[in-house]
Regions:
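Phosphate-binding/switch loop-helix module in NTP-utilizing enzymes
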Residues: 100-150
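Phosphate-binding loop that captures ATP/GTP phosphates
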Residues: 54-56, 60-107, 114, 122
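Residue-level signature of catalytic and energy-coupling elements of molecular machines
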Residues: 22, 33, 59, 67, ...
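Conserved catalytic-core segment of NTP-binding enzymes
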Residues: 8, 131, 137-217
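Walker A/P-loop phosphate-binding motif and the immediately C-terminal alpha-helix
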Residues: 25-62, 174
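Loop/turn-to-beta-strand initiation segments
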Residues: 90-92, 128-132, 155
Length: 217
């Protein structure tokens, strides 16, 4: 009889060993879709790479894996999970979209999503990285929980927009991150048009540092 718990424990040990070799792990998350989360993740990764850091990007948005599209490698297929796609000397990426047909939707339940995330984390050979940037799906679902449980020492960066509904969802994402013991680096207010007073009020409301997107570089 197969001991599933033993298999999961062994897989977790392998993931921990790989993650411990990576100096900085940042998960980019949002309370809702359409706020520029993926754009933020890839720009953060690219910005770090041109400064000389070794950076990997993991596309953990299983239902909408758009990282390859935004790096201009849409339709690219890989034969091995272990080999991330090299974008530049300092930047490589991995995504579920490298291993499934482009027009096939992912119709998976929670356990299947968690298994897929763990297989990616276990299988990818990042080699030496200064930063691993993880692009999470919007919301606070299974993928986010699986990443938090399997990437020790991960830091969270929350992306929002100035609309009230986005800010409310960001509050939920912030609470979720704290509940699952993610260290929150701060929040990026994308597509920003609010004044300094509003930013200060938002920081006070969320108890987290808020940066407008135009001030990232």
């Amino acid at each position: 009889m197969i001991d599933k718990n033993a298999i999961l424990l062994e897989r977790k040990k392998k993931i921990d060993a790989k993650m411990d070799k990576i100096k900085h792990k940042i998960v980019v998350m949002s309370g809702k879709g359409g706020v520029g989360k993926t754009t933020t993740a890839i720009n953060l990764a690219y910005g770090l790479s041109v400064k000389g850091y070794k950076v990997g990007v993991l596309d953990a948005d299983l239902h909408g894996p758009n990282v390859p599209i935004m790096f201009g490698v849409e339709g690219k297929k890989l034969s091995k999970v272990s080999e991330p796609l090299k974008i530049s000397d300092n930047l490589c990426i991995s995504s579920l979209s490298f291993f499934i047909p482009d027009d096939n939707p992912v119709i998976w339940k929670g356990p299947q999503k968690i298994t897929a995330i763990m297989e990616l984390l276990e299988g990818i050979e990042w080699k030496e990285l200064d930063f691993l940037i993880v692009d999470l799906p919007p919301g606070t679902g299974d993928e986010t929980l699986a990443i938090a449980q399997n990437i020790n020492g991960a830091n969270a960066l929350i992306v929002s927009t100035p609309q009230n509904v986005s800010i409310l969802d960001s509050k939920r994402a912030l609470k979720f991150a704290k509940l699952i013991n993610l260290n929150v680096l701060g929040m990026i207010e994308n597509m920003s048009g609010f004044d300094e007073k509003f930013k200060k009020n938002l920081e006070k409301s969320l108890s987290v540092l808020v940066k407008t997107a135009e001030k990232l570089y």
